[in-house]
Amino acid sequence: MARVGPGRAGVSCQGRGRGRGGSGQRRPPTWEISDSDAEDSAGSEAAARARDPAGERRAAAEALRLLRPEQVLKRLAVCVDTAILEDAGADVLMEALEALGCECRIEPQRPARSLRWTRASPDPCPRSLPPEVWAAGEQELLLLLEPEEFLQGVATLTQISGPTHWVPWISPETTARPHLAVIGLDAYLWSRQHVSRGTQQPESPKVAGAEVAVSWPEVEEALVLLQLWANLDVLLVASWQELSRHVCAVTKALAQYPLKQYRESQAFSFCTAGRWAAGEPVARDGAGLQAAWRRQIRQFSRVSPAVADAVVTAFPSPRLLQQALEACSTERERMGLLADLPVPPSEGGRPRRVGPDLSRRICLFLTTANPDLLLDLGS
């Protein structure tokens, strides 16, 4: 009798007719390969990884190494518009980006005087990482505005009577997520205030007319309108040094984005490796259930091992505690059931109790039917 080995699930056996020795004899069978054999090669790689857990761990470690912010920062590029370099303070920004360690590209941008961030995925990209980790997502754009240019847009914006998504400085065709930055607006408004009092002559009648019509209350109103209507952030900085710190902070945040995306894509991103993730072993005879119950109590915030031991000693299982809660006649009695349980004091310490806060949280945990209920009022 012929044996069909592993991977021959789609193999069929057929005879070729009658044998030489007569109609009762059968010739050796022939094998015909079905379409399912083509799937063997596709699944062989996954099977090889399953048989080699060490190789799978190495691949996961390499993928996590590529997700480290310092590694992502090397593949991050800040595209700076050429018009920004015409400003005398642009050297401060360029030196800060160079010290950060990311790539800096000087190339024309639209709109002018803007910065963009681009991130390149590693080549080759590890297969163990979800594709959304390296998705480019929404591109960030930071537009630098001169104070007078910003104030002219504010004067236009404050004349609009209703909600609008239109922004004076940014084209509607822009696909990136825009942010605005204005350098020296406070000092500029202060100087314009002295100009209006006649202390010095304005440089341009057009600019002076625009500036006299806009005051700080109108600027603050425009900032609120931009945030509520257009979801647009406006950064007001006093110097190029402050702007450089902000640009570096945004660059570092974008370098941390892939690792955060990877952690959020995991089933339980809050679990860490080691004993905590492994849990408590529970045997078929019930050995270990009390330790698992003690660990569950420890998962509540601000619960020490001594407090957890006090609860588990009084109620060795959650079912016993639930029955005790159901036996309470009033809600107040139910909430304070565990409050007066004594906690063994440490060396030289004073006697303690479980307290009403933890008693209330454990009671709600075992009795509520609302999955969105916030147990910890202090969080």
From Swiss-Prot:
Subunit and interaction comment: Part of the heterodimeric MUS81-EME2 complex; the complex forms specifically during the DNA replication phase of the cell cycle.
Protein name: Structure-specific endonuclease subunit EME2
Chain residue ranges for the region called Disordered: 1-55
Lineage, uppermost ranks: Eukaryota, Metazoa, Chordata, Craniata, Vertebrata
SMART domains xrefs: ERCC4
GO CC, one annotated term: nuclear chromosome
Domain of life where this protein originates: Eukaryota
UniProt keyword annotation of S-adenosyl-L-methionine present: no
Organism of this sequence: Homo sapiens
Residue segments, region Nuclease-like domain: 50-266
Presence of keyword Nucleus: yes
Family matches, as CDD domains: XPF_nuclease_EME2
Mutagenesis or variant effect for residue 295 to E: No effect on cleavage of 3 prime flaps, nHJs and 5 prime flaps
InterPro entries referenced in this protein's UniProt entry, alphabetically: EME1/EME2_C (IPR042530), ERCC4_domain (IPR006166), Mms4/EME1/EME2 (IPR033310), XPF_nuclease_EME2 (IPR047523)
Xref: PANTHER family: CROSSOVER JUNCTION ENDONUCLEASE EME2-RELATED, EME1 PROTEIN
